[in-house]
Curated annotation (Swiss-Prot):
SUPFAM superfamilies: Ribosomal protein S5 domain 2-like. Belongs to the RnpA family. RNaseP catalyzes the removal of the 5'-leader sequence from pre-tRNA to produce the mature 5'-terminus. It can also cleave other RNA substrates such as 4.5S RNA. The protein component plays an auxiliary but essential role in vivo by binding to the 5'-leader sequence and broadening the substrate specificity of the ribozyme. The keyword Transmembrane does not apply. It is an enzyme of class 3 (hydrolase). Its EC number is 3.1.26.5. GO terms for biological process: tRNA 5'-leader removal. This is Ribonuclease P protein component. Gene3D superfamilies: 3.30.230.10. GO terms for molecular function: 3'-tRNA processing endoribonuclease activity; ribonuclease P activity; tRNA binding. It catalyses: Endonucleolytic cleavage of RNA, removing 5'-extranucleotides from tRNA precursor. The keyword Hydrolase applies. Keywords: Endonuclease, Hydrolase, Nuclease, RNA-binding, tRNA processing. It comes from Clostridium botulinum (strain Alaska E43 / Type E3).
Amino acid sequence: MIYRLKKNIEFIIVYRRGKSFANKTLVLYVLKNKRNKDKDGIAYSKVGISVSKKVGNSVVRSKCKRLLSESFRLNYNNILKGYDCVFVARNPMRDSDYFETEKAMKNLIKKAGLYYDEENGIKSN
């Protein structure tokens, strides 16, 4: 199950206290959160997605959000748990397809040191 950042204050905390990583199409803000645990005490990560009106009209913004959500969902098992992540779309994302979006997202997750390759048991930095 993918947990989401929903409240404005959650986004603000990640923006202010977290570290940022950027590439051409995305910006990633990451904050370690020790409180992200389910009933069984297992840690999980939360994701928030932000797409400004500068990126495009509502159709374009919605497409960007869907692409980011799907990329995160499919790569969730390869991301270290216990972090709050906020992805902010930049203008060039309006023209990118799913594969470019996923590549940009993986690039940022690896830059942040949160990517974990399950097959090889390797944490990427």
